[in-house]
Amino acid sequence: MVLLDPLADALSIIKNAEAVGKDSCTIRPASKLIGNVLKVMNDRGYIGDFEFVEDGKAGVYTVELIGRINKCGAIKPRYSVGVTEFERWEKQFLPAKNFGVLILTTPKGVISQYEARENNVGGQLLSFVY
């Protein structure tokens, strides 16, 4: 089986595990991008702790779920967003103002739209979580 978008697969695994009420889930294959997105989700309080486990291949992330995710997904295509355009994309992908988070990749790394506003930096949209 060929994975065309590992980030989208990882987010759908998390969403489906949350929907059936599981306490944890396993994401494979692991990558730096997925790890950085999980870190942002952890910092914003959507997931519990996560850890990388080496399995002799690409590795595995074990994620502790806390029941805070209603929906999450990857944004395709990866739209480029300037600092002044965040509100437009929040209206498109998030259900209400100040509810949920957009995750984007910037020259400063993978961060949320709130941190991007503080740092006055734009980037490309990766995913949304609420």
Curated annotation (Swiss-Prot):
One of its GO terms (biological process) is translation. GO terms for cellular component: ribonucleoprotein complex; ribosome. Keywords: Ribonucleoprotein, Ribosomal protein, RNA-binding, rRNA-binding. PROSITE patterns: RIBOSOMAL_S8. SUPFAM superfamilies: Ribosomal protein S8. It comes from the Archaea. The keyword Ribosomal protein applies. One of its GO terms (molecular function) is structural constituent of ribosome. Pfam families: Ribosomal_S8. Belongs to the universal ribosomal protein uS8 family. HAMAP family: Ribosomal_uS8_A. One of the primary rRNA binding proteins, it binds directly to 16S rRNA central domain where it helps coordinate assembly of the platform of the 30S subunit. Part of the 30S ribosomal subunit. This is Small ribosomal subunit protein uS8.
